[in-house]
């Protein structure tokens, strides 16, 4: 058994907040605060308002979550392209 059971829920990013935080509305209508997982930060995955994401929520605090996947949708907004390539 895992140290802590996590709930996986889908939602849509409503707002991008300072310090890599996000406000996400879950499928059931609940609004939670979230942050990007370390794997997403390491791989420079951008999360924009309107993106569909998968969250992990702890059973102990259902107001905070960790974004661990950004779904690719045809109608989701695209990040702006910068002129310089990544190193």
Curated annotation (Swiss-Prot):
Biased composition range(s): Pro residues: 77-87
Molecular function GO labels: ribosome binding; rRNA binding; translation initiation factor activity
Location in or out of the cell: Cytoplasm
A GO cellular component entry from the record: cytosol
Residue ranges of the region described as Disordered: 68-87
UniProt function note: One of the essential components for the initiation of protein synthesis. Stabilizes the binding of IF-2 and IF-3 on the 30S subunit to which N-formylmethionyl-tRNA(fMet) subsequently binds. Helps modulate mRNA selection, yielding the 30S pre-initiation complex (PIC). Upon addition of the 50S ribosomal subunit IF-1, IF-2 and IF-3 are released leaving the mature 70S translation initiation complex.
Subunit structure: Component of the 30S ribosomal translation pre-initiation complex which assembles on the 30S ribosome in the order IF-2 and IF-3, IF-1 and N-formylmethionyl-tRNA(fMet); mRNA recruitment can occur at any time during PIC assembly.
The protein's name in its UniProt record: Translation initiation factor IF-1 2
Name of the gene this protein is made from: infA2
